[in-house]
Amino acid sequence: IWGWADPGTWVTVRFNGAYYEAQTGEDGKWMVTMPPQPAGGPYLMEVNEISIRDVLVGDVWLCSGQSNQETPIQRLVEMFPEINVSNNNMIRHYKVPTQEIREEVQEEIAGDAKWISGVASEVMNWTALAYFYALEAYQNTGVPQGMLVSSLGGSEIESWISQEYLKDFPRLILDKEALAAQAEASKDKGEGIWNLPDIDDSDWGTMEMPGT
């Protein structure tokens, strides 16, 4: 368990009948390490005056990929109507917000994302693959399941590799200024001949719209 506070602050973590203490360093960071805990919950965790309720202890899975991993569960409701009445508080889902970072790993995740449960009021915010995996795993083990989803449809593998390792492949290294110029140029679509008020379109043919 880790976090931030003013430098030199003593932090007490109370969980499952035990106490753990740590003092922040000059950078304001603190961390406590707990021994393995029995699977179950929900539990209450207290960090100084902060209370964190509905905490589960169980298995946590990292789910990553492209659109197949990111597909929202609401697209599957027609095929699996039981999703609408999901009532499982022992499975949890966290979707990492998409954030463009070009140079270094970030310590904090952008946005206001949070853990959500598998109850009907929250399940429509899940990704589909994570939901069915968590449900199957919980039904077979009885252990709470946490699905940490870090995915982005259509992303290339290079997007998931640090610059340190990409340096071994010079053909993948792009000049920052050239990349920025390319991105800016892509926004300029131009006027286009078709947009001129005096263009003669009398010889343009007709076409049927797909699906009509």
What is each PLM-predicted segment?
Residues I1-T212:
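Cell-envelope and extracellular/periplasmic
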